[in-house]
């Protein structure tokens, strides 16, 4: 699929306005579906979201980025909090947030108290030499990373 041609098609069909710049795939994007660059007007899109969620969801992501694009060049509010942006996004049925990707699941560090057996899940590592169990002040041992 030629991405720029696809974005031009979505722009004409869903907005009635022309897309005059370039659309590119960007493999480095991790948590976002796409980005708009006001300096030169091009759009970047996350190819992993297209592969994982399909064309229907990807089209909604394209609509979201095109809302930024068209509002910026019309001189209207193009940021997420602006009323113009919210109204246009609702009108074209674009996604407000990018869907979570499969490999973006939360990772936790698991620790267990040697004395009472209480288990702790933490997003950040815990220094087991310095910190102990909050219930019995026993020694914590690292179990694994989930």
Curated annotation (Swiss-Prot):
| This protein's name | Protein SprT-like
Per UniProt, residues of the SprT-like domain are 6-141
The prosthetic group or cofactor this protein requires is: Zn(2+)
- Give GO BP annotations, semicolon-separated: response to stress
Lineage runs: Bacteria, Bacillati, Bacillota, Bacilli, Lactobacillales
What's noted on cofactor binding?
Binds 1 zinc ion.
Q: Which organism is it from?
A: Streptococcus thermophilus (strain ATCC BAA-250 / LMG 18311)
Subcellular location, record wording: Cytoplasm
**What cellular-component terms does GO give this entry?**
cytoplasm
Per UniProt, what is one GO molecular function of this protein?
zinc ion binding
Pfam families reported for this sequence: SprT-like, Zn_ribbon_SprT
Residues where Zn(2+) binds = 64, 68
Q: List, from the UniProt record, the residues annotated as the active site of this protein.
A: 65
Look up keyword Metal-binding and say if it applies.
yes
Q: Which InterPro entries match?
A: SprT-like_domain, SprT_Zn_ribbon, Uncharacterised_SprT-like
* Recorded family membership: Belongs to the SprT family.
Keywords of the record: Cytoplasm, Metal-binding, Zinc
